[in-house]
């Protein structure tokens, strides 16, 4: 496993259908897409990254409302975070405001020249949103 200073940070965009996942580089400067998974697949990939690279922290997007208030999804995210903590005891798991991450991800994908069909491929938006969540976290802690 890597030394403590080079452990990775995972970013997660939780959705009811898919879970977008991003991974920091070893220096924790950039978010890289890892893919989209269901819960079972997520546990497998987190276990693999933990064993191969080490995980310092898992950052889960927390969807606050425009007014900064909790909403219907925040309760779902709270339960998801509790499940992650149970599955990965000893791993730090934090939430990070993901306000409008999916909307921003869609705009970035559109601006990148991706066709509408490409932008709407399963998981592409979820992974892009996970990257935005993780990059926001990395930028705010640099």
Curated annotation (Swiss-Prot):
It is found in: Cytoplasm. GO terms for cellular component: cytosol. SUPFAM superfamilies: Ribonuclease H-like. Coiled coil: none annotated. It is an enzyme of class 3 (hydrolase). Could be a nuclease involved in processing of the 5'-end of pre-16S rRNA. Belongs to the YqgF nuclease family. This is Putative pre-16S rRNA nuclease. It comes from Chlorobaculum tepidum (strain ATCC 49652 / DSM 12025 / NBRC 103806 / TLS) (Chlorobium tepidum).
């Amino acid at each position: 496993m890597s030394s403590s200073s080079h452990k990775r940070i995972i970013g997660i965009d939780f959705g009811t259908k898919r879970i977008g996942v991003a991974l920091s580089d070893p220096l924790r400067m950039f978010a890289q897409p890892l893919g989209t998974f269901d819960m079972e697949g997520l546990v497998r990939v987190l276990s693999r990254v933990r064993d191969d690279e080490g995980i310092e922290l898992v950052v889960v997007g927390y969807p606050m409302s425009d007014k900064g208030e909790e909403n219907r999804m925040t309760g779902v995210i709270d339960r998801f975070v509790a499940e992650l903590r149970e599955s990965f005891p000893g791993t730090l798991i934090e939430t990070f405001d993901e306000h409008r991450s999916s909307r921003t991800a869609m705009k970035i994908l559109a601006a990148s020249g991706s066709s509408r069909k490409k932008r709407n491929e399963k998981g592409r938006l979820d992974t892009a949103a996970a990257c935005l969540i993780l990059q926001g976290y990395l930028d705010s802690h640099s």
